[in-house]
């Protein structure tokens, strides 16, 4: 352990101001983080009157030397950093040297510690802002104990913001839960008013971490927990997706993000999670999760917020796409069946059946299936870009994977990798093919196209009126709802897949086509849309690419067995290697 030093004025000026102690849970958080930084294996926490009377945190870490006790409770004194460059590579919870000084300023605090190099423990006592301290020897095992009494005794205005003891206790309990879920190898014992409230036993094996999860949140059914474990170069993502045991909105959501074992509030990670789930179930906030992201410490900036609960990623786009694709990939491995990018069913492999942490229970599948079958819940459960599903025949029994999207190239193409082969895929053509398959699948399965209102007035002749009259039922089947008068017709709705087209031009062309054909059939309309619909998108990003590839996996995975030349082109790596070798 490095000795505690006073930070230079130039270094302390570069550090974001530390957290103001606002409530007992703030004290608990700071003291627990200090114990973890001291490599403690056992931590005892005790509170009286929800921490307002007394807070005690005792650990068996490496302790503090006698001559450093006064420094330990001084402002801007720390063993974690000593130069400006250290701020770019922080591997500890604390680094500002302000925690104990801030706690000392608003309480009567006693610090007792025995270092690994000493046979005698020493204590130091301080009250509020007073510079008077009392140092004396005392019996204590190796480690540190901090007793915080009469919190805010000298700042009574702070007490006015304390709602009640119960709410403060719940905040303390939440703080301890967050620490327990990121430090599996530590025994944590929590006492409330001298009675053991909860204990979290240390987890020594990685595959037993889920038991800590169950201890922390005992309402969780492990049959509804899906484990996430992905890696990309020096970045790893581990954690759990937690589904409610019933699809009830009353299930308490748990949304915890950890970066390098530090609990953080990070909208980037949450956005990646929500958007990946939106691809599956059509609801961004319908699941709970606990995720642990690990990456080199020099890739993040912790020194931006007093609580250190907010961080900044230096390469945020990479982090976003890694988390986004990792969750989709994990769902694939458990054979998630994509249904129009909005909901999922699941079939279990033998591995899934034998490992609760890797899979969802079949009960969840049956509940989802049951909800899917209820007509009155279609709109809530399945909302597609194109159709309202009303036929179970739409569910397919295969799940196909054709490779991994690496990067987006020149805004329109994606670099794919599969089975030692690199290929370029055209996103615009892929999107058009998917729309064609959707349309054919809908008509084949008697699906009702989803529509949207669009006012279109078209003047017609007597002959054209007769043609439309003969084709009204077929047009309605495709979502064209029109009011036919003697000399004109008024179009009220059109199918939603036409929404992004140049409608005035397209509709005029469409009805001219009908007047020319006179009698039209389903295949005529499908063929016309196949050749006429344009995919008007100026550029594609990585997320767009993932979305269209997911649609291909569901609607038309067989297209990659013999792909059109303009859809997919393999890159001849051997030719390139020959050139490079020369």
UniProtKB/Swiss-Prot annotation:
A single cellular component GO annotation: mismatch repair complex
SUPFAM superfamilies given in the database record: ATPase domain of HSP90 chaperone/DNA topoisomerase II/histidine kinase (SSF55874), DNA mismatch repair protein MutL (SSF118116), Ribosomal protein S5 domain 2-like (SSF54211)
InterPro entries, per the entry: DNA_mismatch_repair_CS, DNA_mismatch_repair_MutL, DNA_mismatch_S5_2-like, HATPase_C_sf, MutL/Mlh/PMS, MutL/Mlh/Pms-like, MutL_C_dimsub, MutL_C_regsub
GO molecular function: ATP binding; ATP hydrolysis activity; ATP-dependent DNA damage sensor activity; mismatched DNA binding
Keyword set includes Mitochondrion: no
Gene Ontology terms describing biological process: mismatch repair
The entry's keywords: DNA damage, DNA repair
General function of this protein: This protein is involved in the repair of mismatches in DNA. It is required for dam-dependent methyl-directed DNA mismatch repair. May act as a 'molecular matchmaker', a protein that promotes the formation of a stable complex between two or more DNA-binding proteins in an ATP-dependent manner without itself being part of a final effector complex.
NCBIfam families the record matches: mutl
Family to which the UniProt record says this protein belongs: Belongs to the DNA mismatch repair MutL/HexB family.
Protein name (Swiss-Prot/TrEMBL): DNA mismatch repair protein MutL
Taxonomy of the source species: Bacteria, Pseudomonadati, Pseudomonadota, Gammaproteobacteria, Enterobacterales
Gene: mutL
């Amino acid at each position: 352990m490095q000795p505690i030093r006073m930070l230079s004025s130039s270094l302390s000026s570069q550090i974001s101001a530390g957290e103001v102690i606002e409530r007992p849970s703030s004290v608990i958080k700071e003291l627990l983080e200090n114990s973890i930084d001291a490599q403690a294996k056992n931590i005892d926490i005790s509170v009286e009157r929800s921490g307002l009377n007394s807070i005690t945190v005792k650990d068996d870490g490496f302790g503090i030397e006698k001559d450093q006790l006064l420094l330990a409770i001084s402002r801007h004194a720390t063993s974690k950093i000593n130069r400006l460059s250290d701020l770019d590579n922080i591997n500890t919870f604390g680094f500002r040297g302000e925690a104990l000084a801030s706690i000392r300023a608003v309480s009567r605090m006693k610090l007792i510690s025995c270092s690994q190099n000493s046979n005698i423990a020493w204590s130091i006592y301080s009250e509020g802002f007073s510079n008077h301290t009392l140092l004396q020897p005392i019996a204590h095992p190796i480690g540190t104990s901090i007793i915080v009494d009469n919190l805010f005794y000298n700042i009574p205005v702070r007490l006015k913001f304390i709602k009640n003891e119960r709410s403060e206790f719940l905040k303390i309990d939440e703080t301890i839960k967050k620490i327990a879920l990121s430090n599996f190898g530590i025994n944590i014992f929590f006492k409330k008013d001298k009675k053991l409230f909860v204990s979290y036993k240390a987890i020594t094996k990685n595959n037993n971490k889920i038991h800590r999860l169950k201890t922390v949140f005992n309402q969780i059914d492990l049959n509804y927990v899906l484990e996430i474990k992905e890696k990309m170069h020096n970045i790893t993502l581990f954690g759990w997706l937690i589904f409610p045991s019933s699809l009830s909105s009353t299930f308490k959501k748990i949304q915890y993000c950890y970066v390098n074992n530090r609990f953080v509030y990070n909208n980037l990670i949450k956005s990646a999670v929500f958007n990946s789930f939106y691809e599956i179930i059509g609801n961004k906030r319908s699941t709970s999760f606990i995720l642990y992201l690990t990456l080199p410490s020099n890739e993040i900036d912790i020194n931006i917020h007093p609580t250190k609960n907010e961080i900044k990623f230096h390469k945020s786009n990479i982090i976003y796409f890694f988390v986004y694709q990792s969750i989709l990939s994990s769902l694939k491995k458990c054979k998630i069946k994509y249904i129009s990018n909005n909901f999922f069913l699941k079939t279990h492999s033998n591995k899934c059946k034998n490992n609760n942490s890797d899979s969802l229970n079949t009960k969840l599948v049956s509940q989802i299936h049951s909800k899917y079958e209820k007509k009155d819940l279609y709109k809530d459960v399945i909302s597609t870009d194109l159709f309202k599903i009303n036929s179970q025949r739409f569910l397919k029994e295969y799940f196909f994977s054709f490779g991994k999207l690496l990067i987006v190239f020149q805004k329109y193409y994606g670099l794919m990798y599969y089975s030692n082969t690199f290929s370029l895929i055209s996103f615009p053509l892929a999107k058009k093919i998917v729309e064609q398959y959707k349309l054919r699948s809908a008509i084949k399965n008697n699906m009702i196209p989803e529509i949207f209102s669009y006012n279109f007035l078209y003047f017609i002749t007597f002959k054209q009126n007769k043609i439309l009259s003969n084709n009204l039922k077929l047009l309605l089947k495709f979502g064209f709802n029109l009011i036919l008068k003697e000399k004109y017709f008024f179009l009220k709705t059109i199918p939603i897949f036409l929404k992004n087209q140049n409608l005035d031009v397209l509709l005029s062309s469409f009805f001219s086509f009908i007047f020319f054909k006179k009698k039209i059939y389903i295949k005529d309309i499908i063929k016309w849309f196949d050749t006429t619909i344009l995919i008007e998108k100026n550029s594609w990003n990585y997320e767009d690419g993932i979305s269209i590839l997911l649609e291909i996996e569901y609607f038309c995975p067989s297209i990659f067995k013999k792909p059109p030349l303009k859809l997919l082109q393999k890159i001849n790596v051997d030719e390139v290697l020959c050139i490079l070798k020369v």
